[in-house]
Amino acid sequence: RKIVNIEAETMVDMARRQILPAVEKFSSKLAQDIAVKKSIAPVVSGIYETTLVTRLSDLVEDIDAAVEDLAAALATFHKIDDVTESANMVRDVLLPKMAALRAPCDEAEQRTAEGCWPFPTYGDLLFGVE
């Protein structure tokens, strides 16, 4: 119970304070780049960038909704005193909501430029240890 609570609280905090701002900053920069390219060369389609900005915006919405959903579930979880009831809530509610938050965050990581992502990549962790 305690470990899942810490993990869920950490997910909420990381998403709110680091992931959402990083994705927003990257997508805003990308949108500015599209505008600059089109002002210089109006024939530039910017399809890739426009599609990416749109998808990142959708992911921001998904992440935000999942964060709020998980935070609300945590608020309910904190009010439960019964061990069996809290264990059932972990299994039936918290873990699925944590997975629901992780999915759009993982996709956002894949679509956000490495230098803009606030955490080391899996490759950095696997091969960067000396």
What are these regions (language model features)?
Residues R1-E130:
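C-terminal amphipathic alpha-helical interaction region
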